[in-house]
């Protein structure tokens, strides 16, 4: 009741504060924003391996991670890495290494695909029967990335970031849900 009063009657809002530590959801937000900045460039590009390799050779990955941190965590697009605390420098390094050492080299080496969507809402109805009655269940969510493979397969990519430990076990672990 008191929260309702402050929010709806008195129109008071809690100040937006920046937490001292980057929690798992914010880590995921930073990673997803960086991937979106980088991969937006290759949406619709057939066999984007060379473009990805070019991004890896230049400073584009680090710049995308910094932009994602500035927009989503610091909420200051003019900030630079010199403004980062030790914890934020660590997050920047982990996200950059995750992209430069895993996701992007893997995609560059296995580039028989075309990115068709980023952060796209998807929904799928699944029909089944239970106790002789036809039922329908809807699965819905946001796909981090959707690729059309050369063989006609549609691939939905989910960057796993919600685990409490932020370790990268290898590219294959991305596809096992680890």
Provide a role label for each language-model segment:
Residues 1-2, 19-30, 57-65, 69, ...:
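Secondary-structure capping and boundary motifs in well-ordered enzyme cores
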Residues 1-41:
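C-terminal, charged and often intrinsically disordered regions of DNA end-processing helicases
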Residues 15-16, 48, 174:
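Residue-level signature of transmembrane alpha-helix interfaces in integral membrane proteins
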Residues 34-119, 123-129:
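A non-catalytic, helix-rich entry segment at domain boundaries
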């Amino acid at each position: 009741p008191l929260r309702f009063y402050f929010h709806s009657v008195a129109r008071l809002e809690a100040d937006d504060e920046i937490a001292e530590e980057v929690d798992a959801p914010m880590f995921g937000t930073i990673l997803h924003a960086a991937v979106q900045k980088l991969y937006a460039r290759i949406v619709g590009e057939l066999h984007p391996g060379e473009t990805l390799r070019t991004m890896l050779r230049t400073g584009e990955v680090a710049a995308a991670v910094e932009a994602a941190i500035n927009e989503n965590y610091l909420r200051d697009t003019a900030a630079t890495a010199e403004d980062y605390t030790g914890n934020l420098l660590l997050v920047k390094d982990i996200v950059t290494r995750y992209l430069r050492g895993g996701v992007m080299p893997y995609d560059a080496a296995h580039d028989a695909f075309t990115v068709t969507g980023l952060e796209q809402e998807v929904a799928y109805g699944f029909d089944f029967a239970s106790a002789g009655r036809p039922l329908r269940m809807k699965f819905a969510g946001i796909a981090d990335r959707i690729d059309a493979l050369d063989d006609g397969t549609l691939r939905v990519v989910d960057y796993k970031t919600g685990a409490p430990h932020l370790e990268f076990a290898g590219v294959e672990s991305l596809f096992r849900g680890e």
